[in-house]
Structures are given as C-alpha cells and as structure tokens.
Amino acid sequence: LTPYNYLYVHRAEVTVDGKRQTLFVPRRCMHCDNPACATICPFSANHKNQNGAVVINPNQCFGGAKCRDVCPWEIPQRQSGVGIYLHVLPDFMGNGVMFKCDLCNDRLKEGKKPGCVEACPRKAMLIGPRKDIEAEAEERARRMKGYIYGQKEDGGTATLYVSPVSFE
C-alpha cells in the first residue's frame, strides 16, 4: 500500500478440499472497532466516525507514523512533502502526512457508497448497517462452508472478510 493506493487486491492461489482455487483478498484499512491508531496519535489527527470509518485529518497530522506502528496490518503510510508541518514546524516530526483508506468518507457524507464498493464487478464488497452486513456475511460463509474474519479478531473491525479458507 502507498499513500496513493488505499486498496490493494492480493491474488492468492490456495487448495480447498483438494481443489486449486484463486482467492482475491483486498488489503486496506480494516476500520477497527477500537482503533489503536486513533488513540495513540499525539495530535488527535485520527478518529472513528459514527459511520464506522477511521479517518486521518491531514490538517492535523504531523506524520509521526505512530498510527502505522500500532496498526496490526501496517496500513497507514506516509506521504512526504505535504502537510501542515511544512508551514508550521518544517523541521519537526515525520516529514509528511499519514494516509489510508477512509471508506471514501466524503462520498459517505453525501450518501454515496465508497468507490471500491461501487466499482466491484462481483459485488463482493458491501456497506451498510452492521447487522445487515453480518447477516449477509454469515449467509455467504454458510453457502461456501467458509469463515468470517473481523467480527471479533483484533478487537473487531468494521470490515468483514468471508473466505472458503480459514484465516489462521
């Protein structure tokens, strides 16, 4: 992941019940229920919105990268050469601003879906009330005799993954 690439879809070849399968695993911010990145930021630049999105305010971020260091997936990435510190304290902190997926927060505020959800050709990505998403995840997992990741793992996340392969 980079500051310009908030979502990376990893292609994985696996064997399930003796059959070779290709899985496509999106790698992006999991929007944790209790995000360590939001609590550790000394500048309070990270916060979790009511809609579940964990967002970094680029006008408050000094690029210290503590959020990346505590993220189980090392998702937030620094973009050098931008940010408030250039004007306020040019020799201070991390030389940039941290960026990551924010679920297209501006789109959510307008009542639109995140770009990845709207663009997904297989409708594998969904967004909505937690109860509805969990019910859909459970149904999909049941149909494929699969597994759900994100309900309780790492404290629970606003992002759930369903897979025919165990996440362990």
Regions found by a protein language model. Name each.
Residues 1-168:
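Non-ligating segments of multi-cofactor redox enzymes
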